[in-house]
Design a protein with these regions (language model features):
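Bacterial N-terminal signal peptides
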Residues: 7-18
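Short, Lys/Arg- and Gly-enriched loop/turn segments at beta-strand edges
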Residues: 62-74, 124-134, 222-232, 334-336
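Intrinsically disordered, low-complexity linker/loop segments enriched in Gly/Pro
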Residues: 97-101, 107, 122-210
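A generic structural signal for residues embedded in beta-strands
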Residues: 57, 116-119, 216
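Short alpha-helix capping/helix-loop boundary micro-motifs
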Residues: 38-44, 100-106, 198-203, 299, ...
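N-terminal, Lys/Arg-enriched amphipathic/low-complexity engagement segments
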Residues: 27-95
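Conserved mixed alpha/beta catalytic, RNA-binding, or beta-rich assembly cores of soluble enzyme
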Residues: 175-202, 206-284
Length: 360
């Protein structure tokens, strides 16, 4: 993956990292390497790496234990062999309030509160030939319309990168992790893995596929990154409460930018794809989440982007507000995670200055 323009510009602020010293490690999903249902500043890291290092992380789906999958028609040979020991090996007392089995936390040794942790999504692999989708009784965006539970198994074609939803209905796959986050502030305690917040977490943002870059304000020593809730695909809204839930392995690179969250006044995560800048907002109220996402994009365009990259156009807040209204998209991310999510996508193609256009 080629780093994005802003990521390239931002690297001038990160700790000096020797290329020779960079390492790649693998973190499998086992009873001792997962955080079941929570993010926490008090969690003990299962792996510690350094700024610039890469970690390959194996993750579990939210489809449930092997017996549930078999009851829905999945052949035992199609279920990862490590899933049963995972479910049997994590005591109830060690589980948090949420339902996601997250791999991690991974500590980045240099990260401290006030820093920005940059996470580059380098690779995502589909690990099984099936996904599940389902809703519980009274769950999802229309609980009164569907007062019962329903689950289905959906075959995946990993070669064609499609899902066979039904005869005559084929869904293109765009794998991503529904949950990618760091520890929230210590005062949040053991934060439920379901609602996204200022730590990121269960953002369920389908834009965050391979090639995306996330920027988190660090709240705890080590940052404590976790990932899981693999999706083979999803529609904006995720209205029945699940996507094409599946097993993914992700390759992530971590880069620490010392003091940048303090200097930028960055309070909420933001992201980039190869084609867009992304701001996010999360709230129990959809209007509030939308206001947050729009304000975060205004702040990025008018205050943060040029400060990081002098080639970025200088925009007033008035101009940034107008640019969002005339050329950017405000999208619902999801409507089912307690806190609704909204994101603003600002296309990089808008910025046509010669120096911007010449950058990789």
């Amino acid at each position: 993956m080629r780093p994005s323009r802003l990521a390239l510009a931002a690297t001038t602020f990160c700790l000096s990292v020797s290329l020779a010293a960079q390492t790649t490690q693998t973190l499998l999903a086992t009873p001792t390497t997962v955080a079941w249902g929570y993010y926490s500043a008090q969690a003990k890291p299962v792996l510690t790496v350094h700024s610039g290092d890469t970690v390959i992380m194996q993750t579990a789906s939210t489809c449930g234990p092997p017996d549930r999958l078999e009851a829905e028609g999945v052949k035992p040979s199609e279920i990862p062999a490590w899933l049963d020991p995972l479910y049997k090996g994590v005591p109830i007392s060690d589980r948090g309030p949420g339902g996601h089995i997250l791999t991690g936390p991974v500590a980045i040794a240099e990260a401290q509160p006030g820093d920005i942790l940059e996470v580059r999504v380098l690779k995502i692999s589909l690990d099984t030939d099936f996904a599940c989708n389902g809703f519980g009784a009274g769950r999802g965006f229309l609980p009164d319309d569907f007062p019962y539970g329903h689950t289905r198994i959906i075959p995946l074609n990993r070669t064609a990168m499609t899902a066979d939803f039904a005869p005559g209905i084929t869904i293109p796959l765009h794998p991503f992790f529904g949950s990618m986050g760091i520890a929230p502030p210590e005062s949040a305690g053991k934060w439920n893995s379901a609602p996204p917040w200022m730590h990121g977490g269960n953002m369920d943002n389908k834009e965050l596929t391979v090639g995306s870059v996330l920027f988190y304000p660090v709240h705890a020593p080590g940052a404590l990154f976790e990932a899981g809730d693999g999706h083979a695909g999803q529609g904006n809204g995720e209205v029945d409460i699940t996507a094409l839930e599946t097993f993914l392995t992700g390759t992530f690179q971590f880069i620490v930018h010392k003091g940048e969250a303090t200097r930028e006044h960055l309070l909420w995560p933001r992201a980039e794809t190869p084609s867009a800048y992304i701001s996010m907002g999360f709230s129990e109220d959809l209007k509030t989440a939308t206001e947050m996402a729009v304000r975060n994009m205004i702040t990025f365009l008018a205050e943060q982007a040029h400060a990081q990259n002098p080639d970025f156009p200088v925009l007033s807040r008035d101009d940034a507000y107008a640019l969002i209204s005339t050329a950017c998209d405000v999208d619902i991310t999801q409507l089912v995670d307690t806190k609704d999510g909204v994101h603003v996508l600002c296309p990089k193609a808008l910025f046509t200055g010669p120096k911007m256009a010449s950058k990789p």
